[in-house]
Amino acid sequence: MPRKGPVAKRDVLPDPIYNSKLVTRLINKMMVDGKRGKSQAILYSAFDIIAQETGKDPMEVFEQAMKNIMPLLEVKARRVGGANYQVPIEVRADRRSTLGLRWLVNYARLRGEKTMEVRVAREIMDAANNTGASVKKREDTHKMADANRAFAHYRW
């Protein structure tokens, strides 16, 4: 915790092609070793693959995928009287999108397709169709929160 008060949130610029801040955040999340150009090329190629295979606007498919990935609830460990309880809490809007992007990139990297472009494209298409590993992660998170509903009164 800094002494000078809370740190201001840095705002990202929208990407040049789709004019979307969410796409910029996905590019940043995919970026490895500061290679933004490579990350952009991978994502735009993935969007081209989505457009070819679905025949729809890739931005619409991506937004639908993000809606299906972003969690509403999560559990947070809370220590009460020597015991740790998993307390379900609602997820803030900024954290929802951060978790959604993180899960999307992580599970795209774990896929078996040959190139990252295809992995990202297939993960986004799967998420838009409510299938895929990133959607399963969201469902598991919701199940954990539902299973621990009894401890919801420990919310702070």
Swiss-Prot record:
Tagged with keyword Ribosomal protein: yes
UniProt xrefs under PROSITE patterns: RIBOSOMAL_S7
GO molecular function: mRNA binding; rRNA binding; structural constituent of ribosome; tRNA binding
Pfam family, one: Ribosomal_S7
Function: One of the primary rRNA binding proteins, it binds directly to 16S rRNA where it nucleates assembly of the head domain of the 30S subunit. Is located at the subunit interface close to the decoding center, probably blocks exit of the E-site tRNA.
PANTHER family xrefs: RIBOSOMAL PROTEIN S7 (PTHR11205)
Subunit structure: Part of the 30S ribosomal subunit. Contacts proteins S9 and S11.
Name of the protein in question: Small ribosomal subunit protein uS7
Organism field: Listeria monocytogenes serovar 1/2a (strain ATCC BAA-679 / EGD-e)
Gene designation: rpsG
